[in-house]
Amino acid sequence: TKQENKDTVMDKDIAVITTKFGDIKLEFFDDIAPKHVESFKLHAQNGYYDGTTFHRVIPGFMIQGGDPLTKSEDKSRHGTGGNAAKFFGIGSEDSESTWDLPAEFSTTTHTRGILSMARSQNPDSGGSQFFICVADANFLDNQYTVFGKVVSGMEVVDAIVSAPRDARDNPDDRI
């Protein structure tokens, strides 16, 4: 049976990602990355993340999710989709698919349990994809926007990162 992820904002500061391995509870850093937090919360509230999967799992590094294209069984496009939940000045205001988040770098380090925004080579290209560090990754500091942390469920993150995966680090089964 397929297990779909469903992200639900419980209150102002906590979100829950439900997976077949259990729940991951996230706390947000509104003070250091307000636009990233706002975009993530809006996506969670409007169902954007419902049915998405963790499409990239790298042991000793991180798990990545938040791509709306992972709702499809076609893995070839997994990891290529997603945009900001509203217009933050990057992209074309009348074309939602082009909306990106401006970088909000801080002194917060990428340690185990940190929630950060995935992006392309362009620092101002964050959209909806996020990752959770399973180990310290200080080489990402000041290059990727940290916007929260896991407050409960790191054992779930550890189970996800250990899942069998293909050559593209996409889990064999939907998570």
Report each predicted region and the residues it spans.
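Cyclophilin-like peptidyl-prolyl cis-trans isomerases
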Residues: 1-175
